[in-house]
């Protein structure tokens, strides 16, 4: 799609969002067509909710996020097929795989294990592997990434190349509660089991999060070597584990409760990389 077409879509969707109270399942014409076109572009990976710029900053295409939100007003509840034992669900968003044949999967080039769920408008790149997991609307999962068992990729989240999201990992979405920007995991990161990254935080390229690390916008991320404190962003090539900071003392001067923090214990080295590198045998 040419840039003028995208500009036209953006203009239509911005106008529709300003008048969102008037949008319903009965809405037809230019508004419905524009929202559906935006979702189709997201689904194919032609556009994405956020894009990394040459200077390393991420640009958020807010109009695409708005298109995802508006689609919930347009679509009626309906039967969603594909449950275990021919069970069904009741929802507004169909599966990305609805109507797919073997030819469609071969063309898409990723592997989707039984019980993996991907909602329409999410993009999964060739070479990715989806274990029984959940990928929500508007998300982007890049090539070579594994989304391991019971991991979830939230709405509009951006997952880079050759990332490993371990079992039970949660990557937060943007739709509820509303966030200005999506949660982002950059290329070549390893996110340890049961960790959570939410609220539009960014884990920069090559970083490793140990098991059970929780990072939101208010989480202190402490560099053990320098004492520097980061918020909302893990620096590149960081090895991060769960930790705590001493709390304020009580009025009687007894120690108060410690507070959770994430601790950068070192930068990624060859030893760390050997323990967290992806296995190409699983991506053939």
Swiss-Prot record:
Gene3D superfamilies associated with the record: Hexapeptide repeat proteins, Tetrahydrodipicolinate-N-succinyltransferase, N-terminal domain
GO cellular-component term (any): cytoplasm
GO molecular function terms noted in the UniProt entry: 2,3,4,5-tetrahydropyridine-2,6-dicarboxylate N-succinyltransferase activity; nucleotidyltransferase activity
Major place of residence: cytoplasm
Keywords: Acyltransferase, Amino-acid biosynthesis, Cytoplasm, Diaminopimelate biosynthesis, Lysine biosynthesis, Repeat, Transferase
Localization (cell): Cytoplasm
EC number, as in UniProt: 2.3.1.117
Catalytic activity of the protein: (S)-2,3,4,5-tetrahydrodipicolinate + succinyl-CoA + H2O = (S)-2-succinylamino-6-oxoheptanedioate + CoA
Pathway(s) this gene product operates in, as recorded in its UniProt entry: Amino-acid biosynthesis; L-lysine biosynthesis via DAP pathway; LL-2,6-diaminopimelate from (S)-tetrahydrodipicolinate (succinylase route): step 1/3
Listed PANTHER family: 2,3,4,5-TETRAHYDROPYRIDINE-2,6-DICARBOXYLATE N-SUCCINYLTRANSFERASE, MOLYBDENUM COFACTOR GUANYLYLTRANSFERASE
Name by which UniProt lists this protein: 2,3,4,5-tetrahydropyridine-2,6-dicarboxylate N-succinyltransferase
Species this chain originates from: Mesorhizobium japonicum (strain LMG 29417 / CECT 9101 / MAFF 303099)
């Amino acid at each position: 799609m040419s840039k003028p077409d995208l500009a036209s879509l953006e203009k239509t969707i911005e106008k529709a969002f300003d008048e969102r109270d008037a949008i319903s399942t009965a809405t037809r014409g230019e508004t419905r067509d524009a929202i559906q076109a935006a979702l189709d572009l997201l689904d194919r990976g032609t556009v994405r909710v956020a894009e990394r710029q040459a200077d390393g900053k991420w640009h958020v295409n807010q109009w695409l996020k708005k298109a995802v939100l508006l689609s919930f007003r347009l679509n009626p509840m309906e039967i969603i097929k594909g449950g275990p034992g021919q069970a069904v669900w009741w929802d507004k968003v169909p599966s990305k795989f609805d109507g797919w044949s073997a030819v469609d999967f071969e063309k898409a080039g990723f592997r989707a294990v039984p019980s993996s769920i991907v909602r329409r408008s999410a993009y999964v790149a060739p070479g990715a592997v989806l274990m029984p997991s959940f990928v929500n609307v508007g998300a982007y999962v890049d090539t070579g990434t594994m989304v391991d068992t019971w991991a979830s990729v939230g709405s509009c989240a951006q997952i880079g190349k050759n990332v490993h999201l371990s079992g039970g990992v949660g990557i937060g979405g943007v739709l509820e509660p509303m966030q200005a920007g999506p949660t982002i995991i950059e290329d070549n990161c390893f996110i340890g089991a049961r960790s959570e990254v939410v609220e539009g935080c960014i884990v920069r390229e090559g970083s490793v999060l140990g098991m059970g690390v929780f990072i939101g916008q208010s989480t202190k991320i402490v560099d053990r070597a320098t004492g520097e404190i980061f918020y909302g962003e893990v620096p590149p090539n960081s090895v991060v584990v769960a930790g705590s900071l001493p709390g304020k003392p009580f009025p009687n001067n007894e120690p108060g409760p410690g507070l959770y923090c994430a601790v950068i214990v070192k930068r990624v080295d060859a030893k760390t990389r050997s323990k967290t590198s992806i296995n190409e045998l699983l991506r053939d």
